[in-house]
UniProtKB/Swiss-Prot annotation:
Taxonomic source organism: Cyanothece sp. (strain PCC 7425 / ATCC 29141)
Protein purpose: Forms part of the ribosomal stalk which helps the ribosome interact with GTP-bound translation factors. Is thus essential for accurate translation.
One GO CC term, this protein: cytosolic large ribosomal subunit
GO MF annotations in UniProt: mRNA binding; structural constituent of ribosome
The protein, known as: Large ribosomal subunit protein bL12
Basic and acidic residues bias: start-end ranges: 100-125
Assembly information from the UniProt record: Homodimer. Part of the ribosomal stalk of the 50S ribosomal subunit. Forms a multimeric L10(L12)X complex, where L10 forms an elongated spine to which 2 to 4 L12 dimers bind in a sequential fashion. Binds GTP-bound translation factors.
Gene Ontology BP, a term: translation
Amino acid sequence: MSAATDEILEKLKTLTLLEAAELVKQIEEAFGVSAAAPAGGMVMMAPGAGAAAPAEEVEEKTAFDVVLDDVPADKKIAVLKIVRELTGLGLKEAKEVVESTPKPIKEGISKEDAEAAKKQLEDAGGKVSIK
């Protein structure tokens, strides 16, 4: 690949899921294309191939979202500190996240990072799920 395409690829890797979805919409509008899979795509598959596909998709999941589901009132300050540490948000933004649960804290991260973030938030008193 050329240096220009390598640079674009590296920038794409840093996007959050929300930013990537927004980019897809903008590309669809700008170029008049659709990112949706063709409707007849499943018909062309060999019999039996369709049964294996869902299992492969589950195994291939490499990006996880850490969602803060609930924060007890007496644990808000401790959880707020961890949210700021994990996200780099300012005090006001982190407070809004903690007070508007359920809310994603980190998106599109590795399983190890998601588990570490979950442990930190749970140790501080928050209820967390990984999706």
